[in-house]
From Swiss-Prot:
Residues 1-82 are annotated as: Disordered. This is 12 kDa heat shock protein. GO terms for biological process: cell adhesion; cellular response to heat; cellular response to osmotic stress; cellular response to oxidative stress; plasma membrane organization. Keywords: Phosphoprotein, Stress response. Gene3D superfamilies: 6.10.280.100.
């Protein structure tokens, strides 16, 4: 599930699986526009308001953008992605642990 106003993971997956050669110009244009809109939404949405997977995706996108701009090595990119994923997974574990132990849902405070 994706955050409100963000491109869903199912939509991203189906777009990635279908080769561009099999897409109409309208489909390619729609993908381009929705990808750019999702990227902007990811940059303006605060990190603490993102779901786990949306946060990981945005961190990966940021790493990709940085790598393209600075020529980072693949190892550096992988390290960045792993750091972001670990951070978000840690947040998820803390959330689940708190809920199991009866703490109030922090997203509803």
């Amino acid at each position: 599930m994706s955050d409100a106003g963000r491109k869903g993971f199912g939509e991203k997956a189906s777009e990635a699986l279908k080769p561009d050669s099999q897409k109409s110009y309208a489909e390619q244009g729609k993908e381009y526009i929705t990808d750019k809109a999702d990227k902007v939404a990811g940059k303006v949405q605060p990190e603490d308001n993102k779901g786990v997977f949306q946060g990981v995706h945005d961190s990966a996108e940021k790493g990709k953008d940085n790598a393209e701009g600075q020529g980072e090595s693949l190892a550096d990119q992988a390290r960045d992605y792993m750091g972001a994923a670990k951070s978000k997974l840690n947040d998820a574990v803390e959330y689940v642990s708190g809920r199991v132990h009866g703490e109030e849902d922090p997203t509803k405070k």
